[in-house]
Amino acid sequence: FGQDDAKYGQIKFDLRYRFEQDDSKLATKDKGDASTIRLRLGYLTPEVLGFQAYAEYETNQDFGANTYNSKRNGKVGYEVIADPQEHELNQFWLSYKGLADTEVKVGRQRIKLDNDRFIGNVGWRQMEMTYDSVLVTNQSLPNTTIKVGYINQAQTIISTVQAMQTPFVNIAYNFEGYGKLTGYSYLIDNNENPNQSNQTYGFSFAGKTPVTDDVKAIYRFEYAYQKDYEQNVNQYEADYFHVIGGAEAYGVTAKAGIEQLGGSSENNVFQTPLATGHAFNGWSDQFLTTPDDGLRDVYALLSTKVHGVKIMGVYHDFADDTGSMDYGKEWDFLVTKKFGKHYSLLAKYAYFDADTASNKVDTQNFWLQAGLSF
């Protein structure tokens, strides 16, 4: 709508086609092939007296190959590709900005906190996760963003709902030129999966700063403590840390990191049930649930752009949280390009090489994707 957005509002359109293949050496499962097309169609009203509303419909449909287990179609003999044929009200919220430096948003909404490690929308899957919730964002203090919220229900990536009582606080202070210091508290009380109920308290400092005119240092340090909460009958305590160091220079980004989720036995491990898990610990999704002995992920990433084409490679070495038991290694590769503001293409590949000491098997994943949005 351009300049008429303030008068008439905005229509949001997002169409995404994807072919995905999941092929493992698991003898009891056949290779999964999924050809799907996802549509999101929404309308954002003009702002009136500080109020604004948004409604968004989302649907995902098979478009060709459909030999896969979507977790909803009953095809349990195939590998899981969690993109079911469903349609849903993805977002439906009302916001108010009439208070100074404050926005209050109520309803079904997308929530992405920090890097999505604890609360995110799982945006990689065709149908994202959204939350029936209240979110208050305040920026009254200099360089500070305070987010306080309460989640009553999560609409999952397979279009089911999980009732919960989840208050959260996320406070971030930006040190200009150096990075952002964030402290957080997430209290998840999950009615559907009580073993996923936990309370997490943590902090992070992340940023980048110039070293020379052509080189920037990249860094992140994060620590969190987690224990059981409310309906979880398993009494446990576990720690989490994530350290990244790297540099950007001459159009190339290089990073190395170690991420560790503590664990000691079944149901006594650090878990992040509302995270965008695909963004962490390898794209083959071997560790969306933390193993009983915890997880240590030592990884390295290299990325650049060539004529507007982004190229990325990532290597992971997985072990238990002591480093004494090897789970396997993974190589991930991505090529993607945006064409103007509205079009995009992507190809992605992941190969997980399981260690014989783990209960995993070798797995290959492959994706081709095309997107159109405005």
Descriptions of predicted regions:
Residues K180, A254, I311:
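Conserved active-site beta-strand-loop modules that form the wall/rim of enzyme catalytic pockets
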Residues N232-G277:
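Long, well-ordered mid-to-C-terminal structural blocks that present hydrophobic/aromatic surfaces
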Residues D189-N190, Q226-D228, Q260-S264, A319:
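Short, catalytically relevant binding-site loops at active-site mouths
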Residues F1-I111, V134-I146, Q196-S197, F203-E230, ...:
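Beta-barrel outer-membrane channel/assembly domains of diderm bacteria
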Residues N66-N90, L99-P194, Q199, F203, ...:
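Surface-exposed coil loops of outer-membrane beta-barrel proteins
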